[in-house]
Amino acid sequence: IKGVAGLSVPFTPWSENSMLAVMTSIYQDRFFYIKYFQQPEVPEQEAEADVGITLRKIYYSLSGNSPADDWLKPKALDDGLLDHLVDPEPFPDWLSVQNLAVYINAFESGGFTGPFNRYRAVGIDHTDFSGYRNVKLSMPVCFIGGEADSIDNYVPGVDGYAKPAVGCDDFRGSTLIPGIVV
């Protein structure tokens, strides 16, 4: 590997506590999407009930057009993924009706289990990568994020972009693009 560019999510070195354990602790009394995705079948049933509304709400909520932190706004522990997310009308012009239809068709054909399984595997990732504790990225690394990315606020009160060079021996710089989501 000659170099790495992190997009939206800065590199996080392995730690004793898994990301799932940390987020479960932080969000113990309220909804957090990664915790929600750990349930078998429940997220799929919600998302697949109306794929168009699901994608519109998720894409908008994670975009720079939505109110700040819309994706992470406090929700009750028993809320669903789509509860309290806005389905904007009209939808912002950065995603045409024709392009959205392509994604809708793909998810109607393939479902959401595969994408949700990526989040269900975070505990497995933590175990599998335990051999990499104290290992740093030695190749050139840069980071690019958007000022409107929700990742910056995943841990309340912590700037998720404050230390993008952690775990990198050859960090070349960080760029935050104003007003957008990367």
Model-derived segments and spans:
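Flexible "cap/lid" subdomain of the alpha/beta-hydrolase fold that forms the substrate-access gate
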Residues: 2-172
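Short glycine-rich catalytic loops that host catalytic nucleophiles or stabilize transition states
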Residues: 169-182
